[in-house]
A protein has these predicted regions:
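Gly/Ser/Thr-enriched, mixed-charge loops and adjacent short helices
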Residues: 96-209
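N-terminal small/polar loop signature for handling phosphorylated ligands or for N-terminal nucleophile
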Residues: 20-24, 28-95, 185-209
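Short, electropositive, low-hydrophobicity segments enriched in small/polar residues
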Residues: 1-8, 39, 46, 68, ...
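An N-terminal, well-structured beta->alpha segment
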Residues: 1-51, 55-56, 137-170
Length: 209
């Protein structure tokens, strides 16, 4: 449960340990994308993760509320070193979680995950702290969601041409989750008539119906 088991202090360690391990496998300060769903705890957890990354010297690009597949796609597209999705999938709003993706937009290898877990428990973690100009930087890149919409249009427009008719309507239930920010854009870009429901997230109504 967010802010109970999954505390900001724990999330900070997850991020700092992750930045350390990623740096070991790279010759530069890593750049990490962060995306989240609509849960009320998302901002809290993202803030703690960002602090952990920056404190080690990693750089962060915040994607804001965005579907998990979009984060995976953008990780590879933007040539980021890794990404993090803050979400608890189908669970109700009280829960939240953190998932790392590799630079290929796939789940990080088990051995890297184990390294991160080991470093989280290490007393050495506090010794690795960036100072002065070595501190990481953060920027908001919610605009990158449009790159994902363009990807859909470019790759699926021809396949959906036969459905661009007045008598074909798609109903989409976004469950007040991360898809709520992109469903309208995607189906409009594809030229498909659509009706969207459960599309007004308020932080606590995700997966409610």
């Amino acid at each position: 449960i967010a802010n109970t088991e999954l505390t900001p202090e724990l999330v900070y360690k997850v991020a700092k340990a992750g930045a350390y391990v990623l740096s070991k496998h790279s010759d530069h300060a890593p750049t990490i994308l962060i995306g989240r769903d609509t849960r009320i705890s998302g901002t809290l957890i993202e803030s703690a993760m960002t602090a952990g990354f920056l404190s080690y010297g990693a750089n962060v690009k915040s994607l804001g509320v965005i579907p998990t597949p979009a984060v995976a796609y953008l990780t590879k597209k933007m040539k980021a070193d890794a990404s993090v999705v803050i979400s608890a999938s189908h669970n109700t709003y009280e829960f939240n979680g953190v998932k790392y993706f590799s630079n290929k937009g796939m789940k990080i290898p088990d051995e890297i995950e184990e390294e991160i877990e080991e470093m989280m428990d290490s007393e050495k973690l506090n010794d690795f702290t960036a100072v002065n100009e070595k501190i990481g930087t953060a920027e908001v890149r919610t605009d990158l969601l449009d790159e994902y919409v363009y990807f859909f249009r470019k790759n699926f427009e021809e396949e959906f041409e036969n459905y661009n008719t007045d008598d074909f309507v798609v109903a989409i239930d976004t469950a007040n989750g991360a898809t709520s920010v992109v469903a309208e854009k995607v189906f409009t870009a594809l030229g498909i008539k659509h009706y969207i429901m459960n599309n007004t997230p308020n932080g606590i109504n995700i997966n409610q119906n």
